[in-house]
Amino acid sequence: MREHADKLDADDPLAGFRDRFALDDPSLVYLNGNSLGALPLATLRRMDSMLRQEWGTALARSWDHWVDLPGRAGDVIGELTGAAPGQVLVADNTTVNLYKLACAALDARPGRHVIVTDRDNFPSDRYVLEGIAAQRGAELRMLDTDIDEGLDPAEVRAAVDEDTALVSLSHVAYRSGALADMAGITAIVHQAGALMLWDLCHSVGAVPIDLDGCDVDLAVGCTYKYVNAGPGAPAFLYVCARLREVLRQPI
């Protein structure tokens, strides 16, 4: 068994990536990226350059370089999430971005008053949606998702109707790791005339994502987990091109 494992390690085309991270203990097998990604060595160099040159030496002149970083960094995230340039913006944190997009989605569907999510969604996502529902006088419908099996498209179909404005779900379940059918569920939501908002916090950087290919409307995600951007790193949001001139910033 050990020989087989050693051979798999030796043949792994990604094995060399370990040397790109500040992992001092060679015996450490770090599998907690869902909580906090490891520190890339390149980040140490970039942070030193940013602090010494961009801030320390260039001072206010660096604003000219920094001002469009949210969009440029967003396009890099777009490469991970299957989003064409100009649709992803790095900003704020996941909770704030979820609040902004959910409110904008409700405003974009006047006459509809239902938000759909599931009871196994990440707690802070549920708290935001509960708060918005209370503020707006909307109805929040909770799917009773099987924790181990994950989201069932048939349950989503049964929960949405002509009153549904928004469906907000996690692409990967934070407790079980269950992967949702992004394309199938998004299509069901669109058939009901509602908007689809995906939380990518536990999938970005870990599994393939194709936001444009799945016809997703909106998405949010963080960068400190599998993207390895570090504690306190800003989150990101995605707004599909067809909605950019439709949605309005609520704050």
Regions found by a protein language model. Give the residues of each.
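Pyridoxal 5′-phosphate
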Residues: 1-251
